[in-house]
């Protein structure tokens, strides 16, 4: 009957309901009088009944008779000096009366007792203002303990004591305990009780989803639990809301933890930038808010890291703020003058100004060093800009190849491939360049991509030449069997063109000999159809080759009963 509703700040409907249930001040005073009379009668029947004594004290408190309440509680305390329900009531009462030293001693005894089960029903009796006094006192006491906390094992003892005070403050505050919950969560984190700390941070965030300190705290707990992605997500959310709070928090971390978080934030932004629509259109403000917050925070944490300046430059370019991006690129180049990544970004800015050859010159330096980074940069361009860039790069590559400079041409070749979206003509150009550099494996991979494309009606001659190139590369790698297969495909698609190409390289006699060896091998393994194909292909190259003619006759004899020759 004496307990307050635990709800703080009731709505109008709730207020009407509570008024109906408890009545106005006069009704409440009448209830308290009745409770006091009943408790007094119970004490007369049983003088040892402590519950009745506490009930009487609570009724006196509700009636505003604080001196009598104090006396009644002192009697109860004399009977049970360590009783938590009595200590809690006396502490609240002494705070209300202004006797802070006595209140502090009582709270200290209550903390030492470790009995908190009684607190909620006890505190429900007291008015909101008195509960606030207890919360403020306990919270301040906990902070004082933490400020004076020594190192080592004694520090853990002090932290546990602070947790006890904070728990009292949380009980007293009810739903308005965010500061105490945050402080207690940090204490649990200090003690290594990560999941308990997480519980307190989550409690705060359920009530205040935008609490920046709680987001930061929970992020650090996630980090301690090896949940890097969750930690990064919380930090990003916090940075959107209050970067001024987050940055000092991150700068205070140990180097190892700070490196994990900053690298995670960097990777997060890079992943988002790589997912941009492939249109080159500037991002809207809502899309760049989080990216900008992270980019600016990384520079505030460590302005000497060139990668952070490059990231912010990319974000600004994605937003369309090219002049501001140029400022950060100059800072990155000042710290790393030979950075291909920074020069490539300057090239992108040149392209935006219309200098396509200059852009190609700066961008090609990154093509062979960090192709994924260059691909992300090219996402920031419009389709027409990428097309112009691919053409300019291919033209310069062709000039360098004609001049006998394949090493200098390679970057331009790779730039043309990336800017064109791996167009077949640019892949062929790079394969030629790589072959001159004797990087046969890479050249072969480029041709494989070309050969995987769908074949148009008028593309047979070109496809035949691609197979001839593939075969030559396979020969350079020592795979004669696969080379023979590629040459056979070319002869099947365009016999005349393939004959002329193979007679030039590797030459009529070497090609015929290769088909002869291939046919003999297939025949020994009883693969008659493949042997026949090899012989027929070889005779297309050299119709008068005696060895191929003899092998053809032998295949006929051995398979005279089969129908596979038809």
Curated annotation (Swiss-Prot):
Task: Note down the stretches annotated as region Disordered.
Answer: 1-29
Could you list this entry's UniProt keywords, alphabetically sorted: Repeat, TPR repeat
Residue stretches of each TPR repeat? 50-83, 178-211, 212-245, 306-339, 341-373, 424-457, 464-497, 512-545
* Keyword Repeat (UniProt): yes
Alphabetical list of PANTHER family matching this protein: TETRATRICOPEPTIDE REPEAT PROTEIN 34
* Name of this chain's protein: Tetratricopeptide repeat protein 34
The gene behind this protein is TTC34
